[in-house]
Amino acid sequence: MPQVQRNNEMMRRAGEKEIAYLMRLAENDPDNRKHCIHMHARFDHEDHLCMVFEAMHQNLRQALRQHGHKRGIQIDAVRTYARQLFTALRYMERLNIVHADLKPDNIVVNDKYNLLKVCDFGSATNPDDSEITPYLV
């Protein structure tokens, strides 16, 4: 599933930063077991930065709307998703990566609904590179 970034310098820098995080996540997870989306390739097309990711079916918001809108999802599915999400969060913490935009839209599931992956690392950051602010946002 290709993703195209807008053609301007700020978007290119953001895309390159996201790619750096995706590569770091993949390098430390060669068996693809940590529930973070894997990027298969990156390329430029007509001055646009493009990324190709492993195929997933839909995001978690869509899956919950489709399969749990009236009564929720089964507790076993909640356990499975929670375990996989905590695995991803623990892995990102170990690599000192803060996702910074974790929401159902940025969590994807496969077509069997038994595998969950965190995606969209465009807002990710390293807490050591950030300034601490006394203000709440």
For each of these PLM feature ranges, what is it?
Residues D29-A41:
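Conserved HxN/HPN-centered segment at the entrance to the catalytic loop
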Residues Q5, M56, G122:
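Anionic group-transfer/hydrolysis microenvironments
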Residues E9, R24, D47, L60-R61, ...:
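Conserved protein kinase catalytic core
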Residues R6-P30:
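The N-lobe alphaC helix and its flanking beta3-alphaC-beta4 segment of protein kinase-like domains
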Residues M1-P2:
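Conserved beta3 VAIK motif of the Hanks protein kinase fold
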Residues K34, E46-C50, A55-Y113:
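Conserved alphaE helix
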Residues V108-V137:
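Activation segment/activation loop of eukaryotic-type protein kinase catalytic domains
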